[in-house]
Amino acid sequence: MNSERLAPKRVVMLGATGTIGRATVRALLRHGHAVKCLVRPGTPSAALPDGVEVRACEVTDPLSIRDALGGDRFDAVVSCMASRTGAPSDAWAIDHQAHLHILDAAKGHGATQFVLLSAICVQKPRLEFQRAKLAFERELMASGITWSIVRPTAFFKSISGQVQRVQQGKPFLLFGDGSLTACKPISDDDCAEYLATCLRDADRWNRVLPIGGPGMAMTLRQQGELLFSLAGKPPRFTSVPVVMFDVVIGLLSTLGVIIPPLRNKAEFARIGRYYATESMLVWDDARQRYDAAATPSFGNDTLADHYRKMLRGELADDRGAHAVF
């Protein structure tokens, strides 16, 4: 049984072309697994490493999934796939329904394991994309196959949007006094390594796994202070009132009744408010508070090193849909 657990696996990879997806593909290859990546038709795959198989697939279409998988058998699915915007229709189509299609197909092709990259914010669901993710999590838990649900805190790239502002001598933007929220940020590479180890580490099977990076939890103000220190500039902060979100949400929600496209705009504002007011740490439901000490740490990469590389121009701002600012 132990030798079977340690043997290389045939893995179907979803979300392979995003930053965390690419890192996860690299980690899977380092661990000796054979990786087949399902990507959207027309998606450039040049960024994927040699040694992977790439198949074009519309993940919202069960027939397209069937054609992409062909007659192959495989052992596991690893998914870093997520909706791009968090808009309700996109979230339910990708975070829930597309994953269900993949799960059904995977079981039919011999898969006995599914590793899902979720998000720590689903523990306090207020948004449609969180509800969609939770709905699939429940389906996965009830599926009968071995599962691991990984809920990371903020990624480095998610909290790197103000590096250029600081370099340009502009103030660092805070919500309130900058202490409303905290997180244990984690790098793509460390999170990817954690995902890959879930395939073989039985202690991570059939468990929901919150995970943060190394070091202490940091508030938004502490992130700004770190960035100013590394840039060699005196700290300058500007406070943005959270009530701004409430005004925008109320206005867009009202107008959305008669102008449907504004409903998504209202949801985007709700997403912004959520991240401005909720910490990315484990939620202690009994105490009704976030608990940094209960949020596990993993990896070696630090936010300070990430900021240094960005300040030196060694890393680009690659936030995409992960942008907080």
Question: Where are the model-predicted features located?
Answer:
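NAD(P)H-binding glycine-rich loop region in Rossmannoid oxidoreductase-like domains
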Residues: T43-G108, C121-Q123
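Substrate-positioning beta->alpha
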Residues: G178-L199, R207, T219
